[in-house]
């Protein structure tokens, strides 16, 4: 079975390339990376940075994930990404996508040992406020 880390790489990593000037990028990549099997995945983001740079986000700014979990991290700098969004006329099995290239801060959820990205949580133009660093539980005083 595909691990969560491998699935993240398949769905979100496209190092060493970019979608610039290629409006067909998402149509090709969504198919190539098996996100149009059984249904059209409505929205997906590809990151055009090195895997090491994206893995490094797991030690950057700790923020809360959209689902409320505390294991999300935002990149310290913007990254070159491509947003793929299903178009209105898209109908399975003929999935159709709009390609938009952007520079944004990315947020990923990390887990495991080694601690690696397993979920792409979003991308924003402005950096978030990090969670306060709490001392380890045994050093916390009751307020």
From Swiss-Prot:
Entry-linked InterPro entries: RNaseA (IPR001427), RNaseA-like_dom_sf (IPR036816), RNaseA_AS (IPR023411), RNaseA_domain (IPR023412)
GO cellular component labels: extracellular region
TM region positions: none
Cystine pairings recorded for this chain: 26-84, 40-95, 58-110, 65-72
EC number: 3.1.27.-
A GO term, aspect molecular function: endonuclease activity
Active site: 12, 119
Keyword Heme included in the entry's annotation: no
A Pfam family reported for this protein in Swiss-Prot or TrEMBL: RnaseA
Top-level lineage group: Eukaryota
Predominant location category: secreted
Residues the record lists as binding substrate: 7, 10, 41-45, 66, 85
Region of interest called Disordered, as start-end residue ranges on this chain: 1-21
Glycosylation sites: 62, 129, 133
Top enzyme class: hydrolase
Gene3D superfamilies per the UniProt record, alphabetical: Ribonuclease A-like domain
GO process annotations (BP): defense response to Gram-positive bacterium
Keywords: Disulfide bond, Endonuclease, Glycoprotein, Hydrolase, Nuclease, Secreted
Compartments where found: Secreted
Protein family according to the UniProt entry: Belongs to the pancreatic ribonuclease family.
Designated name of the protein: Brain ribonuclease
Record gene name: BRN
């Amino acid at each position: 079975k595909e691990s969560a880390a491998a699935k993240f790489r398949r769905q979100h990593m496209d190092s060493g390339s970019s979608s610039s000037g290629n409006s067909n990028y998402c149509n090709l990549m969504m198919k190539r990376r098996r996100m149009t099997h059984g249904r059209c995945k409505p929205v997906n983001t590809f990151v055009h940075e090195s895997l090491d740079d994206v893995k490094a986000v797991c030690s950057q700014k700790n923020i809360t994930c959209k689902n409320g979990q505390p294991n999300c991290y935002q990149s310290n700098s913007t990254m070159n990404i491509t947003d793929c969004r299903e178009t209105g006329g898209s109908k399975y099995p003929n999935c159709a996508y709009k390609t938009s290239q952007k520079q944004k801060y990315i947020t990923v959820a990390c887990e495991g040992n080694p601690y690696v990205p397993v979920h792409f949580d979003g991308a924003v133009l402005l950096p978030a406020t990090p969670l306060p660093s709490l001392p380890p539980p045994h050093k916390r005083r009751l307020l």
